[in-house]
Amino acid sequence: MVARSRMGGPWSRAQRVARAFRDGGHEVTLAWGDDGNCADPIAPTLEIPVPSPLGLPEAIARHTFPLASRLGLMGRKPVRSFEEVLWLTGALDERYTRAAVEVLRAHMRASRPDVVYSEFSLAAVIAARAEGIPCVGSGSQPTTAAYASHPRKSAGIRRLLRERGMPAPASSLTVLEGMRRRFIPSCPTLEPRVGERAVYCGFLDEPPALTGRPRDCALVYLGAGSVPVGVAVRTGRELAEALGCDVYVAGVSEAVQAVGDHEVTCAPRFDVADLLPRARVFVHHGGQNSMMDALSYAVP
């Protein structure tokens, strides 16, 4: 999944899956795009188109959508399903999907991979189906049509599928659920209803050995652009005052603020493997990666 909005989860999961395939002795190609999220690939790459938010012209979307994300404007728009997320990012735009599918199909014809792994990429699922290549991928309960959907946003996808003689379900989320296997990097307690052909795989990385380091800080991550920056920073300041410790706020612009004898350090990204072993608490937006990272380090 590539998008103009800042979202580290899809790329980090794709990197982890690619690393596991590579460590198992397989050749891997990572499909990526110039979206500001894909960086430092651990395998050879294939560049694919990046969708324009809401299908806007590229010149407009490249600047306006990241700005809206940084200002937290995206967090002010109610989003009621993952299908709406795909629509907002432009992933349901018919022209984009056609272009991405053709790039992917051309590569598949040339390389004939044994399997395609889709990280919430409709284009990858459609291309693999068209080329007769098995397709598996990531999944979660909130991304199923049964959880929430908005089929009106997927008219272009249905038209594209019908042209290719493929089943065209009402919701594009059903297309993602149609993969041969959907791997859920979570657990039944957190996501009990994930649909058919789903396999819970828990942590994507080996859980770290807990070393008993002093718990001397707190970590805040409320999504990149999911809420206004001021809300995230204010949360960090309140935590520093309440807990009497340093706080790190991820997903916002770089800054350092003093709160009494402690500091609130803000940055777009932090190395969670360095901070979570020290964290007394992790305040986050409920994302799958954040939930599992907190569990793996035994952080409330």
Sequence positions of predicted segments:
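Glycosyltransferase specificity loop/lid
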Residues: 1-117, 126-127, 241, 257-273, ...
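Donor-nucleotide binding loops and adjacent catalytic segments primarily
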Residues: 18, 198-281
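Acceptor-binding helix/loop patch of EC 2.4 sugar-transfer enzymes
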Residues: 73-87, 139-164
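Structural motif
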Residues: 114-115, 181, 217, 281
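Active-site proximal beta-strand in glycosyltransferases
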Residues: 115, 129-145
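A short alpha->beta transition loop at the rim of the catalytic pocket in nucleotide-sugar-dependent
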Residues: 132, 279-280, 298-300
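A nucleotide-sugar donor-handling region in carbohydrate enzymes
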Residues: 147-227, 250-254
